[in-house]
Design a protein with these regions (language model features):
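A conserved regulatory-domain signal marking ACT and ACT-like small-molecule sensing domains
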Residues: 1-142
Length: 142
């Protein structure tokens, strides 16, 4: 099950991240998770939000370059090495992981957001391995 991630390209300058977040606030888009990757010139903000299309539209209207991408949210079992075991399943099928970042949804369980070169293949591997993922419907209830 894929979930939509909102990505925003932002200039790497003081206050720019706050401007993006203010646009989302005005649009009543709730942020569930985010990560920022930066270079000297620009940053890439990746967000899991309650309404990615609404967020994208609000940001585009305000002049921010943004897009929506399919990602997988994996529910991590609570034992040492659980993420390592999941990554071994993915690697065994030669699926490249583009990036990952954490997501905490209820304070008890951990999850990770994963973007792969082949999202459908990664989903199939996870499903076959009995690994729980989060649907967009589950995410919407948070």
């Amino acid at each position: 099950m894929t979930v939509k991630q909102l990505s925003v390209f932002i200039e790497n300058r003081q206050g720019r991240l706050g401007e993006v977040l203010a646009v989302l606030k005005r649009a009543h888009v709730n942020i569930l998770s985010m990560c920022v990757a930066d270079t000297t010139e620009y940053g890439l903000l990746r967000l899991i939000v309650n309404d990615p299309e609404k967020g994208k539209d609000a940001l585009l209207a305000d002049g921010f370059s943004s897009m929506v991408t399919d990602v997988i949210i994996i529910k991590l079992p609570h034992h040492a090495g659980s993420l390592s075991e999941i990554l071994e399943l993915i690697a065994a099928k030669n699926i490249n992981i583009d990036y990952m970042y954490g997501l905490s949804v209820d304070g008890a369980d951990a999850s990770v957001v994963m973007k792969t070169a082949d999202v459908a293949a990664a989903e199939a591997v996870l499903r076959a391995g009995g690994i729980a993922t989060m649907s967009a419907e589950e995410l919407a209830k948070l």
